[in-house]
Amino acid sequence: MDDLRLLRHFEAVYRLLSFSAAADELGLTHSALTKSIKQIEHGWDVQLFHRTTRTVVATEAGKKLYPMAVELLGFAKNVRTSVQSGEHILNIVSGPAILENMIPLAIEKFARRFPNTRINVETMPPHLAVEELVQRRIHLVLYHEATLRGVAHFNRLRVRNVCDEPYWMLFRQGHPVRQAGDSLEDILGFDWAIAGFDDLFENNLSDDVQALLQAHDFPKYRLLSQAACIDLARCSDIVTAIPKTAACPLIERGEIDGLPHPGGFNFSVSAAVLYDAGVEPTVEHFVDCL
């Protein structure tokens, strides 16, 4: 516990680049914080900071320690929360379309086997989500396979594909897109709203497709809600795209019109955990439920 306390002190100094600001944040005196940093330096025989009367600059050893310290502190916080609550917590981050299409049914299946596990699911940009995973503040990320291939820590991830199905276009009844051609260029002349379309996904498309999308400023609207995109498509001239299994029931009920997407894009979802995180039964079973 003492090592965690010292690492917490180091993390604050590194992040704030100020002993005074870190001491204020931690509720310590300047001398007590200085003593903590010296204790690490003497115990490990390293120098963590270059200090003058006005500046604090991390050494190479300090720069190397910081990401590992953040990761360890995040893991310790999760352990403490789990032990204190007496129940297991599963923290997940996904793309918005995945959250709306796959998570509810997965939770319903998962709860049959692990009824006492709490689940927190949120959405955020994929590069931030993977950073949270690396720092062990979450257990699992779920994104389009092409998106995951573009993240900085991809080589640290154990990735498993869990879904692969075609996209369908959705649009209001009587929309002129139904009379448009069947090429990607033909349909890009309309305004589009897409849930969670990100740069990492786009960057993994072929050069000619990227050029075509950029030439049409696709998409015009990016929303963090698939439901909002569907509502826009239902009541305006905006077109959206969602997975086939979500689109077909809406079309069959007459709520909206739709066609297979001519671009050849698939809703290809992958689950990712850290390679060195070990096998957590609840995480593995949640992925099985997707």
Q: Over which residues does each language-model region extend?
A:
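Hydrophobic hinge/microswitch elements
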Residues: 125-126, 134-137, 144, 198-257
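A short LG(V/I)-centered, amphipathic sequence patch enriched
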Residues: 15, 41-58
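Central regulatory/effector-binding core of bacterial HTH transcription factors
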Residues: 87-150
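A late-sequence structural motif
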Residues: 257-290
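Short helix-boundary/capping micro-motifs
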Residues: 11-29
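Alpha-helical linker/hinge and terminal dimerization helices associated
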Residues: 7, 43-44, 65-87, 98, ...
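Secondary-structure junction motif
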Residues: 144, 178-184, 188-214, 280, ...
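Flexible hinge/capping segments at coil-to-helix
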Residues: 154-193
